């Protein structure tokens, strides 16, 4: 497995730009990816601007790994993700940029790649082009998920302040690796968060791409059972119990 083996790029004025390996262009909607393995490229999936309220992409039961840039690169789009594992991307597991609407449930976003340079998850609502500053509305919800990796903090929230735009996000029943100085006192934004330095996900064998939970994982039994109605099975097709685990996998003790 080697990142960057596939994916198109182009160059303008000495700057190199990369397409997504699977690329949904502006205006595309109603797309579904289910039970897929996407690996060894530049950007696993890129989703460009949506033009209405319809979901651009529903991504479920999928593994994305070993990308030289990002697993997901989204721009002002409408994206639903569940039962999905994204790991070992050189920059981001998921970069949710230029605003948009995002819903992640029972996902595992982790980065232990040797060249891991940026947090596993980045949320952003702005960019500058030709000296003009652009700001977009953002709604993002993460539930029963794991965000972890080898950096001191695996979450970046990049909001343009003092602009009359919507910037709403919530992390609910998630295991987050963040810097100890990261403030999560607002329970409307961070609800039932597992984040102490000793709260480790303890995956079975991350070096071999096995991100199922070990018996001592801090992610066990920490999920909100309200999501069992829509997500009763994990990425392996295992039935979740009445106290679901965080992330894409449910651990069933033998």
Give each language-model segment a name.
Residues 216-220:
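AMP-binding/adenylate-forming core of the ANL superfamily
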Residues 1-209, 222-231, 235-236, 249-254:
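Beta-strand/loop edge motif enriched in small/polar residues
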Residues 211-212, 240:
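Conserved beta-loop-beta connector loops within the AMP-binding
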């Amino acid at each position: 497995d080697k990142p960057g083996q596939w994916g198109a790029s182009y160059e303008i004025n000495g700057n190199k730009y990369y397409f997504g390996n699977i690329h949904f262009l502006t205006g595309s909607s109603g797309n579904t990816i289910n039970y897929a393995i996407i690996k060894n490229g530049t950007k696993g999936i890129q989703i460009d601007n949506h033009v209405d309220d319809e979901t651009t992409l529903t991504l479920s039961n999928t593994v994305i790994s070993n990308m030289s840039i990002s697993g997901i690169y989204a721009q002002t789009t409408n994206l639903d993700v569940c039962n999905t594992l994204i790991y070992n991307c050189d920059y981001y597991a998921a970069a949710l940029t230029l605003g948009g609407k995002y819903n992640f449930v029972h996902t595992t976003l982790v980065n232990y790649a040797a060249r891991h340079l940026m947090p596993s998850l980045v949320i952003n609502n702005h960019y500058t082009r030709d000296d003009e500053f652009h700001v977009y509305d953002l709604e993002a919800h993460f539930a029963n998920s794991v965000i972890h990796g080898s950096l001191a903090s695996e979450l970046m929230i990049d909001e343009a302040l003092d602009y009359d735009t919507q910037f709403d996000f919530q992390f609910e029943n998630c295991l987050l690796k963040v810097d100890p100085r990261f403030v999560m006192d607002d329970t409307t934004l961070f609800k039932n968060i597992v984040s102490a330095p000793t709260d480790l996900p303890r995956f079975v064998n991350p070096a071999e791409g096995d991100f199922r939970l070990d018996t001592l994982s801090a992610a066990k039994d920490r999920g909100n059972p309200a999501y069992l109605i829509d997500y009763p099975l994990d990425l392996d097709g295992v039935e979740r119990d009445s106290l679901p685990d965080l992330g894409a996998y449910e651990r069933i003790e033998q």
